[in-house]
A protein has these predicted regions:
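Flavin-dependent oxidoreductase catalytic core characteristic
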Residues: 1-136
Length: 136
């Protein structure tokens, strides 16, 4: 049937449309940010997100001749650069949302300043394999 033949294409088209919408609106919102440092930090995150989506769905971009191999290679290099540029701001960006470490299931941003000690405690207490066996 038509649904069976077009089903995969429809899913891919709707996924592409959703990502387009998110990238477009992310860009619009980032450009409205007045604080220069915040706009710069979130601009990098925006660019990384857009590049990740292009890389993730590169087959579609190549099939439609929307991207060249040279551009694709450049995007992969830019992605690596963005990782390095975003890294210093990563903790601040996560903390800005105000999620607790418990919600994030992470001790890296521990408000008590002991992320490594907390990670070790979580590892010890989160799995029965890490608990000593008690024999009666």
């Amino acid at each position: 049937t038509w649904d069976e033949l077009a089903g995969i294409d429809l899913v891919e088209a709707s996924t592409a449309h959703s990502y387009y919408w998110m990238v477009k609106n992310f860009y619009v919102d980032v450009t409205k940010i007045e604080d220069r440092n915040t706009r710069k930090a979130l601009g990098r995150v925006f660019l990384l997100y857009a590049i990740e989506k292009i890389i993730d769905y590169s087959t579609s971009f190549f099939e439609t001749n929307s991207i060249t191999a040279k551009t694709f290679i450049g995007l992969r290099k830019l992605r690596e650069t963005l990782y390095s540029e975003i890294r210093p701001d990563a903790l601040c960006l996560v903390e800005a949302f105000g999620y607790t470490d418990h919600t994030l299931m992470s001790a890296i941003g521990s408000s008590d300043g002991k992320p490594y000690e907390n990670l070790l405690d979580w590892a010890r207490n989160s799995n029965d394999v890490n608990k000593p066996e008690v024999r009666a």
